[in-house]
Amino acid sequence: MAATLKPDSDGAERLASSTIRRRRAYCLPRFYMNKEVYIRPLRLEDAQMSYQWRNSPKIWRHTLSKPDRHITVEMEAESLARILTRKDEKRFAICLSDNGAYIGNIFYTDIRDGEAQLHIFIGEQRLGGKGRAYSAVCQILDYGFNALKLETVYALVKEENLAAKALGRRAGFKRVLEYYSNEARANVVRFVFTKLMYEQKEHLGMGISDVRGRGGLLPE
């Protein structure tokens, strides 16, 4: 059972509320929703669920970085309050269309000069599959190339993360670079997806596939 969220200060609560009001302008229209999932802007109350994912080794074992301590709901709320003010990031929750259940995160970081890094993970892994991660990627690509006017989206994936690489290929991403990351102590693959590829609908070429991601395309 998720813990009750208690913002640590009135200031943090006001900051989060202001952030949420500003981010409403970025809400995706309902035509982005498919029969399985939709994405919506992250909210402060999502910390009640996401702090549990931050403490799950199964989610973080395939990523380039991971938490270095146990994360409490208060710590997660403080982190979200800061993150949601960043102008170079856009963060969304992945939710089931039938009941609104929050099952994962998808987001852009390092948004600058027409480029952004994509991250995605399914936190509730028992609810993975059925093309849900793929659908979320297609939706955030729509948002990135239309609302943010991006030219390129890229993802960095550990070579060993077979599920993430399969998801990237199904979404039309092209493998362009391999290198060794000293920080992650692993071989890393860079995948890219361009505006031209989006206009040619390459992300839709393979349809919705059943990809059960373990960690997805790199949560932070």
What are these language model-derived features?
Residues 8, 15-21:
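N-terminal polybasic/positive-inside topogenic patches
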Residues 44-51, 73, 77, 81:
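An amphipathic alpha-helix signature
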Residues 53, 82-84, 144:
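Hydrophobic helix-cap positions at the C-terminus of alpha-helices
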Residues 56-59, 85:
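Short helix-loop boundary/capping segments at the starts of domains
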Residues 58-79:
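Conserved GNAT-fold acetyl-CoA-binding loop/helix
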Residues 81-93:
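A short helix-loop-beta-strand connector motif used in the catalytic cores of GNAT acetyltransferases and
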